[in-house]
Amino acid sequence: MLTIELDDLKVFMADDGSAKRIHFATSHAHALRKDSRGKPFAWFNVPFRNTIEPLMKKELGSSNFALFLSKTTDKPFRMVFNEKEYEDILAFMGKYKDIVFLRDCLDLSLSLSMNRIDENTRTEIGELEYQAKYHPESSEYSNVIASLTERMQGFLDSIPFFKDADYICVVPSSHAFVREIVSGLKGFDFSDISSSLSWNKTSELKNAESLEDKLDALLNSHLLIADEVDLKEKSILLVDDLYKSGLTMQYVAMMLKNAGCSRVFGLTLVKSLGNN
């Protein structure tokens, strides 16, 4: 069982410049390349194994699938020796084209989309997230929530692991509309325990500027988990709207694991353009 300690969060905060996301629609569109000499048939290169390796293993239907670390770059790679595996990986990249794979302390961590294409242009989901967050009074608000719910529903229906969680929970500091989305999900076996988590005080969280200040604020905000929720050996899917630094979600995941959870998955609507 993967554990999360306070030191893990501090290491994560000490940004060394390493990539924290994989996005096949943009920065990693050329992760799969045919070898010009045909030896091997192709190469698959990504900056980290987190989340992507277990999902590829499951989606490609091979328990033997693995990404290996390069001795020269210390980055994951895979030699592809035949056209079938090449096409399988290409299909995986197509299915997850807009999804953002995240490197953090959770067992698995994804965003449905980037929030922006560039500084001036939002993605489709990024625009919906923006409208839901900043224009709840709009006559289109219910349609926006319905669209976001439909997208999350479709995503969870189509991928492994996440839909099999025992619980789903909105990160306590999330905007209210995220709970509306989660409450609209249908046909899953997980129970919504969002109301069982809360902060004892949140003012410091809102005022924190640096990651160091935010971690101090998280420690001082005292996350409360209701006693009646049985977390022992349970898996939980944490949901939030925007993944920026990811610190709050990882802190909540740490506290849930300290309370007995075996696995914590993270799913956000959008990933910010910054933070690698």
Specify the residue positions occupied by each region the protein language model found.
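PRPP/pyrophosphate-binding module of the type I phosphoribosyltransferase fold
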Residues: T3-K10, T202-N276
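Active-site-facing substrate-recognition patch
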Residues: A29-A31, G38-A42, G61, S70-F161, ...
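Short, aromatic/basic amphipathic alpha-helical patches
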Residues: L55-G61, I89-F92, R179-D189
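Short catalytic/ligand-binding loop motif for oxyanion handling, primarily in non-cytosolic enzymes
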Residues: A176-R179, N275
